[in-house]
Swiss-Prot record:
The keyword Transcription does not apply. It is found in: Cell membrane; Membrane raft. It is a single-pass membrane protein. It comes from Desulforapulum autotrophicum (strain ATCC 43914 / DSM 3382 / VKM B-1955 / HRM2). The keyword Transmembrane applies. Found in functional membrane microdomains (FMM) that may be equivalent to eukaryotic membrane rafts. FMMs are highly dynamic and increase in number as cells age. Flotillins are thought to be important factors in membrane fluidity. The chain crosses the membrane at residues 3-23. Keywords: Cell membrane, Membrane, Transmembrane, Transmembrane helix. Homooligomerizes. This is Flotillin-like protein FloA. The gene is floA.
């Protein structure tokens, strides 16, 4: 009796465990069976052990079958285990099939694993996207600055989504083309009169090579006149030349002042030499007296000459007014 009770308890526990693992899988199996997806019950059960969500795989399989796509369950599982978005890939395949775009599962999975939004790429292939460039400033040959904004219509190229450049490259190339076109114009009026000249020139350069997009059109949304860069450059150059000339003039003035001071110093030096020479005269006269080369009459005659010279100088020089006299 006790043995029978133990067996019954074990059977009940076994049934509970089986229902725990199979119970939720049965509903998914029935759902797939009714939808014609044909996902095996054991396959659904063992998905849990493979760390794969059964509901996601079964739902994706049903969506693919209902849309007429033949994709195996193993492909869904392998893509999920690789880190891909199974639901987005299935939706992209369905959208591509409805739009008559050749997109195999392997290519869609590769695009998804590369980090691209494959569903958005398919939608952009059907409905092109408009990208607006930021404000681009460039200067024409006459020195006038022009500011332009353009709208680029692009369509996704599914064949180049893996390894192709993104929107940033398109914007950079278009901006470079606009700057080159405006810079090569002889006058800013030429660009203002023919804005389509920019779009035609830029579009003819094949800017979409090596990118994941195909440029359909480039439209100039707005062109504004900016600063007169040429005049500003000339003004700055004139101001710089003025400062250089002022610096050179200041240098010449400093040199002239230094030379003037040097000449004054030389004059003082010459005067000092004269005074020194005059101081040697009495010594020379005394030596002449001792040697007998100069007599007393000669000495007085020389004194008379000096006195006459001083008198003539005093007569020739006008007297200065004495400020102390009333």
């Amino acid at each position: 009796m006790e043995f029978t009770t133990i067996v019954v308890i074990l059977l009940v526990i076994a049934c509970i465990v089986v229902l725990f693992f199979i119970g939720s899988s049965i509903s998914l199996w029935v759902q797939s069976l009714v939808s014609g997806a044909r996902v095996g019950l054991l396959n659904i059960v063992f998905m849990r052990f493979r760390k794969v969500p059964p509901k996601l795989i079964v739902t994706s399989k049903i969506m693919a079958v209902k849309s007429g796509l033949e994709i195996s369950t193993d492909d869904f599982e392998s893509h999920y285990l690789a880190g891909g978005d199974v639901s987005r890939v299935v939706k992209a395949l369905i959208a591509a099939d409805k739009a008559n775009i050749d997109l195999p599962f392997n290519r869609a999975a590769a695009i998804d694993l590369a980090g691209r939004n494959v569903l958005e790429a398919v939608q952009m292939s059907v409905n092109p996207k408009v990208i607006e460039t930021p404000l681009i400033a460039a200067m024409a040959k006459d020195g006038i600055q022009l500011k332009a904004i353009s709208r680029v219509t692009v369509r996704a190229n599914i064949d180049r989504l893996v390894g192709g450049a993104g929107e940033e490259t398109i914007l950079a190339r278009v901006g470079e083309g606009i700057v080159t076109t405006i810079g090569s114009a002889n006058s800013h009026k030429m660009v203002l009169e023919n804005p389509d000249l920019i779009s035609k020139t830029v579009l003819s350069k094949g800017l979409d090579s090596g990118t994941a997009y195909e440029i359909l059109s480039i439209d100039i949304a707005d062109v504004d006149v900016g600063k007169n860069i040429g005049a500003e450059l000339e003004t700055d150059r004139a101001e710089a030349d003025k400062k250089i000339a002022q610096a050179k003039a200041e240098e010449r003035r400093a040199m002239a002042y230094a030379m003037e001071q040097e000449m004054k110093a030389r004059v003082q030096e010459m005067r000092a030499k004269v005074v020194e020479a005059e101081a040697q005269v009495p010594l020379a006269m005394a030596e002449a007296f001792r040697q007998g080369n100069l007599g007393i009459m000669d000495y007085y005659r020389m004194k008379n000459i000096v006195s006459d010279t001083d008198m003539r100088q005093s007569i020739a020089t006008p007297e200065k007014d004495d400020p102390d006299q009333p």
